[in-house]
C-alpha cells in the first residue's frame, strides 16, 4: 500500500486523490453511521433536474428519459461496464449506453452545477454519438480523447477526439501475429477496451462474435507493440516480453478483461468459473476459481492500480477484501473488525476506476436485492456507498437510495455504477422503483442517474 501511496502523491494530478492520501476525508458530508434510513416514496424528477436524496442527503441529477434517443423513442439507458472510464478526467464529459441500438451517447457536464448539456455536434435529444464500438473508455490523461475499437473494423484499436470529431486507428490487431491468425470477418469482433494509468497500454478481448466466446486477450503497448494470449491454446506471443506456453493447464473462453493501472496485470473474467490474472510481463497466469473457498474469489469485483477488490458474501454483504494482483492469496479485510449485527440479503456491484491512479482511494458501489424486492429493511439496502481502502480505518460512506429493482430477465435493471476519476461523481442505472414506464411490451425502462459524492 505504501508504494502506491508514494507513487500517487508524486505523479497524480487530481487534487482530491492526493488530499485523501494525506489524511483529508474525501466525503465529509456523507453519512457514516449504521442506522437504518427508510426509503421515502418519491416520483422520478424530470431529466436534468438537480435534487436531493430525501433519506441519505446526496445531490443527484437524472440524465436520461424517454426522449433522449430520438431514433428509439422511449428507449432505456444504462451505464457501460464499470471497468471502463465512463467519465473524462476533468468531469466535463461522460457517456451512457442507449439500450435499443447500443449507441454510446456522450454529454457535457458541469461539475459545479451538475448540469447536463449537449456537446457540439449532438443531435436532437442532446447525446453525441461516439463512433466507436460498445464499451469505449475515456483517456486517463486527456479529457478530449477516447479509446475503443472501430465500428467498421472491430479488430482495430482506435481513438476518438471530441474536438475534431475524428476517429484514428492505432493498431489493426489482425497484424499482431496471433496464433492462429485473427482474420477479419462478420463472426470476428472485440470488446472490453480499458487503459493503464498512463494511457500507454490498452487491452481488448478479441475473436469470435460475442463475449464469453473470445479466445484472445490482446495488450497493445503504444511504444512496444502487441502482446497476446490465446486462452484456448495457452500460447502467449507478440512483439515484446517472453513467449511460449502459460504456466497453468487451464483452457477457457474470455468473458471480460481489464488492465490494471500500472499496466502489468490483466484480469480475465470467465463465466461461472471465476477469473485469472495474467502478469503481462511474463507467462504467469494465476487462477482465482469461485469454488476455492479459501481464496474467496466469488462476487463482483474491481481492479485498481495493482490490486483487486471483491465482496464474496462472507458473513456480511459489505464484507470486502483487497488483494495484490500479484498474490491473490494475500487478502486484507477492508471492514475490520466487522461490526455486528451482520447484514445479508443484498447483492452489490463495484466501481473503482479511480483506483487505477491510486490504490488508496475509496471503492464505491451500489447494493440491490437479488430477488427484485423494492423494500429496504435494514441499513445499506438499495444504497450507493463507498468503503475506505487505505487501511487507516474502515469507514463506509452512504449517499443515496438507488431505487433499482433487479429482474434477471432484464440485464439493464441491475444498478451498474461508474465513478469519475477524481472520485466526486457516481453514475448508475435505475428503474426508480419501476416508475419509468416500459418499452417493447412490458420491459421496464431504466435511466441513468448521477450522485455527487461529498
What are these regions (language model features)?
Residues 73-84, 90-149:
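Blade-loop segments of beta-propeller domains
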Residues 121-210, 230-243:
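Asp-box/WD-like beta-propeller blade repeats and closely related beta-sheet repeat scaffolds
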Residues 102-108, 153-161, 210-219, 271-279, ...:
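Structural motif
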Residues 94-95, 145-146, 202, 266, ...:
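Hydrophobic beta-strand positions that form the internal "hydrophobic ladder"
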Residues 77-90, 127-143, 185-198, 249-262, ...:
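Structural signature of eukaryotic scaffold interfaces centered on beta-propeller domains
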Residues 411-454:
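Blade-level signature of beta-propeller repeat domains, shared across WD40, Kelch, NHL, RCC1
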Residues 26-62, 66:
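Blade/loop signatures of beta-propeller domains
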Residues 315-323, 332-404:
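Loop/turn-rich, solvent-exposed surfaces of beta-rich toroidal or solenoidal domains
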Amino acid at each position: 500500500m505504501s508504494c502506491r501511496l508514494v507513487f500517487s502523491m508524486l505523479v497524480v494530478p487530481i487534487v482530491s486523490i492526493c488530499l485523501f492520501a494525506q489524511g483529508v476525508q474525501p466525503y465529509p458530508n456523507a453519512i457514516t453511521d449504521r442506522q437504518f434510513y427508510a426509503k421515502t416514496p418519491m416520483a422520478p424528477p424530470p431529466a436534468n433536474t438537480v435534487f436531493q436524496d430525501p433519506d441519505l442527503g446526496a445531490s443527484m441529477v437524472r440524465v436520461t428519459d424517454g426522449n433522449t434517443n430520438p431514433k428509439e423513442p422511449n428507449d432505456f439507458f444504462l451505464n457501460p461496464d464499470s471497468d471502463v472510464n465512463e467519465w473524462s478526467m476533468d468531469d466535463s464529459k461522460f457517456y451512457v449506453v442507449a439500450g435499443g441500438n447500443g449507441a454510446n451517447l456522450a454529454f457535457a457536464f458541469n461539475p459545479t452545477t451538475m448540469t447536463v448539456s449537449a456537446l457540439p455536434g449532438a443531435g436532437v435529444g442532446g447525446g453525441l454519438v461516439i463512433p466507436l464500438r460498445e464499451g469505449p473508455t475515456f483517456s486517463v490523461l486527456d479529457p478530449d480523447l477516447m479509446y475503443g475499437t472501430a465500428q467498421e473494423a472491430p479488430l482495430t484499436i482506435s481513438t476518438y477526439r471530441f474536438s475534431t470529431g475524428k476517429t484514428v486507428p492505432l493498431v489493426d490487431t489482425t497484424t499482431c501475429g496471433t496464433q492462429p491468425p485473427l482474420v477479419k470477418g462478420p463472426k470476428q469482433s472485440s470488446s472490453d477496451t480499458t487503459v493503464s494509468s498512463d494511457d500507454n497500454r490498452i487491452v481488448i478481448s478479441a475473436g469470435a462474435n460475442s463475449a464469453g466466446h473470445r479466445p484472445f486477450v490482446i495488450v497493445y503497448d503504444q511504444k512496444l507493440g502487441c502482446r497476446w494470449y490465446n486462452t484456448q491454446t495457452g500460447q502467449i506471443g507478440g512483439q515484446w516480453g517472453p513467449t511460449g506456453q502459460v504456466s497453468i493447464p487451464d483452457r477457457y473462453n474470455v468473458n471480460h478483461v481489464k488492465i490494471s493501472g500500472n499496466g502489468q496485470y490483466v484480469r480475465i473474467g470467465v463465466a461461472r468459473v471465476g477469473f485469472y490474472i495474467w502478469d503481462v510481463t511474463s507467462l504467469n497466469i494465476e487462477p482465482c476459481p469461485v469454488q476455492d473457498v479459501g481464496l474467496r474469489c466469488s462476487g463482483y469485483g474491481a481492479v485498481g492500480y495493482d490490486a483487486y477488490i471483491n465482496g464474496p458474501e462472507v458473513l456480511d454483504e459489505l464484507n470486502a477484501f483487497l488483494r495484490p494482483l500479484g498474490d491473490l492469496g494475500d487478502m486484507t479485510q477492508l471492514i475490520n473488525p466487522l461490526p455486528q449485527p451482520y447484514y445479508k440479503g443484498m447483492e452489490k456491484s463495484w466501481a473503482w476506476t479511480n483506483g487505477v491512479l491510486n490504490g488508496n482511494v475509496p471503492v464505491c458501489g451500489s447494493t440491490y436485492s437479488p430477488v427484485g424486492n423494492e423494500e429496504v429493511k435494514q441499513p445499506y439496502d438499495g444504497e450507493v456507498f463507498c468503503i475506505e481502502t487505505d487501511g487507516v480505518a474502515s469507514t463506509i460512506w452512504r449517499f443515496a437510495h438507488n431505487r433499482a429493482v433487479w429482474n434477471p430477465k432484464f440485464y439493464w435493471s441491475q444498478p451498474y455504477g461508474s465513478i469519475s476519476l477524481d472520485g466526486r461523481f457516481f453514475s448508475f442505472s435505475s428503474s426508480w422503483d419501476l416508475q419509468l414506464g416500459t418499452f417493447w411490451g412490458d420491459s421496464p425502462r431504466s435511466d441513468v442517474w448521477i450522485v455527487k459524492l461529498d
